[in-house]
Amino acid sequence: MKNYKVKELMVPIAEYATVPETATLFEAVLALEKAQEQFQATRYSHRAVLVLDKNKKVVGKLSQMDFLSALEPQDTNLEQIRMFKQFGFTRKAVVLQQEEYLKNSPPILDVYSKAAKNRVTQYMRRPTEGEYVNENASLDVALHQLTAGSNLSLLVTRDKDIIGILRLADVFAAVYHSMKESELKLADGETE
């Protein structure tokens, strides 16, 4: 794996779904949909949108889970029900309580409409220290960062600039192909 460099597997920012920090959640969904359509034919689809400031610098990331979380009702009663699990209630008991409570919540189309108008900055996650990897880092370094931080992607840097995104799916594909190639060579009696 050491023969791969991060920059060989990353998706350049120019090819990734991005929106300005002034965008709404709906605009971010449209950007993700467009990027998935354009990228689908060649590689794995995008699963996040990068949020850019007015200087085109990455200030956050909005994942599919962040999108879905934006549609969850946000009120104290529901938050208290979610906390039942830490008091020993089973996941099933918590889900049943949530379902019962949600029967009286607003219609889902109203929830979608309200969330769609909110700014992406309300739901995005700002990158943390462990989410950056240098473009010249070896793939094994990136693999460690992905697994140690349970990250689905890493932001690829050149000096202080973010130039791309390294996705778990692309790393997995590279590792899988390297493993397959290595095993086939061993099966044929070759040594490295």
What are these regions (language model features)?
Residues 32, 43-65, 146-149, 154-169:
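A glycine-centered beta-loop-beta connector
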Residues 19-46, 68-75, 132-150, 175-179:
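The conserved cystathionine-beta-synthase
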Residues 16-19, 58, 114, 133, ...:
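Short N-terminal micro-motifs specific to bacterial/archaeal maturation
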Residues 1-15, 64-131, 143, 147, ...:
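Tandem CBS (Bateman) regulatory domains
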Residues 27, 46, 50, 85-86, ...:
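Residue-level signal for alpha-helical context at structural boundaries
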Residues 3-5, 35-37, 53, 106-109, ...:
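Residue-level detector of functional hotspots within protein domains
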Residues 1-31, 159:
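N-terminal hydrophobic targeting segments
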